[in-house]
Design a protein with these regions (language model features):
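Short helical (or helix-break) motifs at transmembrane helix termini and adjacent helical loops
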Residues: 141-151, 206-219
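Hydrophobic alpha-helical transmembrane segments of integral membrane proteins
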Residues: 113, 176, 227, 244-245
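Membrane-embedded alpha-helical bundles of polytopic integral membrane proteins
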Residues: 1-167, 171-202
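Interfacial loop-to-transmembrane junctions
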Residues: 55, 220-243
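C-terminal transmembrane helix pair
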Residues: 218, 243-250
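Membrane-embedded alpha-helical segments of transport systems
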Residues: 142-145, 172, 210, 237-245
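Juxtamembrane boundary at the C-terminal end of a transmembrane helix
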Residues: 252-261
Length: 261
């Protein structure tokens, strides 16, 4: 089985599990929230392994755990912080030739990416559960499409010092293929066609940014993969990096839509 086939198979299995979980809300209304908690803890554990000392790893995990006690009325602040940290890190990668991060930056950046993504998932689920599923499906497809087109046609590397596997051809291929895929999917998920196409055009660069930023952090920490739990991907961070980046932006959008939208 090729690496692409492994990536697609692993992604499909996890998406089926997610679909079952979301549909199980009729019997257990809080099961998606529990799932988000488990995923956040798994991602946090993998991220904690980026640190060279056990004390920093433990402190990071405790910080994430203690943050779950934050009252929900403060979630919007974390969503905004999450969007800002993603934008600042991605711009840093674009503007500087060979950026790097120290342990303190890795610590605070990780916290301001992972916890805001967790609360964003809760906000999205409570507002429009279908969007949570759509984000994960679209990111998984965009990631696989970029990998396929990059392997098949890739010639021009976009960020050789940060993420040498990312090519212009792969990004363009995903940017074209993802809206088409979501347009076909829109009939199955009862989604507006034009909305699905626009969504696909937005999700592709967000997924790309998530992948690149986590590659930057892993390179700074001298880590190749977050773990080896998921065939074809590596770990949960490697699988969900695009979703972790995308969720705060869509949560921010939902928070600012008119009530009767």
């Amino acid at each position: 089985m090729t690496n692409l086939q492994k990536r697609i198979s692993s992604g499909l299995v996890l998406l089926v599990i997610l679909a079952v979980i979301i549909n199980a809300t009729r019997l257990m209304p809080n099961i998606p929230v529990y799932t988000l908690v488990i995923l956040a803890l798994l991602v946090s554990y993998e991220y904690s392994r980026f640190f060279k000392t056990k004390s920093l790893s433990l402190m990071f995990l405790l910080t994430i755990l203690m943050s779950t006690l934050v009252p929900s009325e403060y979630y919007s602040h974390f969503v905004i912080l999450g969007c800002l940290i993603w934008l600042s890190l991605f711009l840093r990668i674009l503007l500087y030739d060979n950026p790097t991060m120290g342990s303190a930056e890795i610590f605070f950046s990780g916290y301001l990416m992972i916890f805001p993504s967790f609360v964003s998932g809760i906000i999205i689920f409570e507002s429009y559960a279908k969007l949570l599923m759509l984000v994960l499906i679209a990111v998984s497809f965009a990631d696989s499409a970029a990998y396929f087109f990059g392997k098949k046609f890739g010639r021009r590397i976009l960020l050789k010092n940060t993420s040498p596997g990312k090519t212009l051809e792969g990004l363009i291929g995903a940017f074209i293929a993802t809206p088409i895929f979501l347009a076909l999917l829109s009939t199955l998920m009862d989604i507006n066609l034009s909305g699905a196409i626009i969504f696909g055009m937005i999700i592709t660069p967000l997924s790309f940014a998530g992948d690149v930023v986590f590659s930057f952090i892993k390179r700074s920490a001298n880590v190749k993969d977050s773990s080896n739990l998921i065939p074809g991907h590596g770990g949960f961070i490697d699988l969900l990096d695009g979703s972790i980046a995308s969720l705060p932006f869509f949560a921010l959008l939902l928070m600012n839509l008119p009530e009767n939208f």
